[in-house]
């Protein structure tokens, strides 16, 4: 990270660091998790090290470089990336596609109290080009030299897992029963053959998340005003449920399932 920034400084270039939206989870204990600024968490030890490394180390290195050298250096906090809007292809070996595959392999999916904000990969790519100024953009140029700004590459249009996504999957042709989350984990564990049940490979991961009675996740609310002003592709959010995109995901997975 430091060598990359040093090279960018010598070449009078710019540096954009792709962080993760999960880094903002560290801000839950701060004044505002929605803030589009770099902050210093005082309770970071209570959260996972993976997020800590991004918010407290990598993100702050970028911020320090921008503040002390005058170079353009920005952090892009990127949310959950999904398949593209044209073909719907989404890597079937990722955790979410594997989870959804149990609709086909086991005939079940869990009922989750979760709010989601997925963003198609091609929209993410376009937004990065806009925010970085590679695609000419007066607003991103105007914000370029403000070292405190963090861009949230997020979808401001959210949807609900059980109320929105599961019906959309059924409308896309998948037939499955909806189980309480702990029962879904038990069903997942009941078929140990990874050829019949590829999702079993992530049993520990899903058991840790869902084999409990913890309340659902409402998700973080991100400050999007500055990001959307500099990225036309993100302005107003991207609709996933009512555009046929879920059906394209399922169609792209069908030959692989």
Give the label of every model feature segment.
Residues 1-52, 74, 81-87:
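Conserved Rossmann-fold NAD(P)-dependent oxidoreductase catalytic core, especially the SDR/UDP-sugar
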Residues 3-14, 65-72, 134-145, 172-176:
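Secondary-structure transition/capping motifs at alpha-helix termini
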Residues 20-23, 77-82, 120-125, 154-157, ...:
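Short, flexible loop/turn elements at secondary-structure junctions
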Residues 48, 63-136, 168:
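NAD(P)-dependent short-chain dehydrogenase/reductase
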Residues 52-62:
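Phosphate/diphosphate-binding loops
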Residues 53, 94, 119-122, 159, ...:
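Residue-level signal for the nucleotide or nucleotide-sugar donor/cofactor binding architecture
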Residues 127, 131-211, 229-230, 253, ...:
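Mid/C-terminal beta-alpha module of Rossmann-like enzyme folds, strongest
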Residues 217, 221-257:
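Amphipathic terminal alpha-helices
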């Amino acid at each position: 990270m430091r060598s990359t920034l040093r090279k960018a400084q010598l070449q009078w270039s710019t540096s954009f660091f792709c962080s993760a939206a999960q880094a903002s989870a560290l801000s839950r204990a701060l004044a505002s998790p929605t803030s589009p600024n770099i902050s210093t968490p005082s309770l970071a030890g209570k959260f996972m090290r993976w997020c800590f490394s991004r918010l407290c180390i990598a993100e702050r290195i970028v911020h320090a470089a921008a503040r002390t050298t005058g170079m353009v250096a920005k952090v892009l906090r990127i949310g959950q990336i999904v398949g593209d809007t044209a073909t719907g292809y989404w890597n079937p070996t990722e955790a979410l596609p594997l989870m959804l595959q149990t609709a086909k392999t086991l005939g079940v999916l869990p009922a989750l109290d979760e709010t989601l904000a997925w963003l198609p990969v091609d929209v993410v790519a376009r937004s990065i080009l806009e925010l970085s100024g590679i695609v000419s953009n007066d607003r991103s140029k105007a914000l370029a030299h403000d070292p405190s700004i963090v861009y949230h590459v997020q979808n401001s249009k959210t949807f609900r897992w059980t109320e929105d996504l599961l019906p959309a999957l059924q409308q896309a042709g998948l037939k499955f029963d909806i189980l309480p989350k702990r029962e879904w984990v038990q069903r997942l564990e009941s078929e140990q053959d990874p050829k019949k049940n590829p999702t079993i490979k992530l049993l520990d991961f899903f058991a840790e998340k869902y084999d409990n009675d913890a309340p659902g996740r409402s998700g973080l609310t991100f400050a999007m005003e500055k990001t959307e002003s500099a990225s036309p592709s993100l302005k107003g959010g991207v609709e996933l449920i009512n555009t046929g995109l879920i059906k394209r995901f399922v169609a792209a997975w069908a030959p692989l399932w």
